[in-house]
C-alpha cells in the first residue's frame, strides 16, 4: 500500500479526499473494479465522500460506470455508458423512489437496500428520470 499499513482508510479513499482538498470537480476512478470484492464495495461506498463534497466522481471500467448521488437526476440515453441501468440504495430505505423512461418504470416505491427490483433495467425514452426524497443511491450504467 502507498500509505501506512495501519491506516484507517483505503488508498482509494485517501486519494479521493486529496483530490477534493486540491479542488477537483470531477474524478474518474480506474482500476477500482478488479480484484477483491471487498475493495470494490469499499470503492463504491467511497464515492459517497465525493457526492457529499459536490464532486462528480465515478468508477469506470470496460463495462461499467458506477456513481453515487443524493439528488434526483435525469440521464440522457445518448450519453449513457451502456443500455442497462441498475440502481441501489446505499444507505437505508429510499423513500418515494421513481424511475421514468425505463423498460420497467417505478412510481413512488420505497427502495430497500436488499431490493433487486432495480437491477438491469433499460433505457426506453431519450431521458430517464430518477427521483427520490432522501438518502444516497448507487447508479450503475452497464453494457455487455
Task: List each model region and its residues.
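N-terminal glycine-rich phosphate/adenylate-binding segment common to multiple enzyme folds
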Residues: 25-36
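Short beta-strand segments
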Residues: 30-32, 60-61, 88
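Short Gly/Thr/Asp-enriched flexible loops that form oxyanion-binding sites at enzyme active sites
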Residues: 34-48
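Long, charged alpha-helical interface segments
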Residues: 69-144
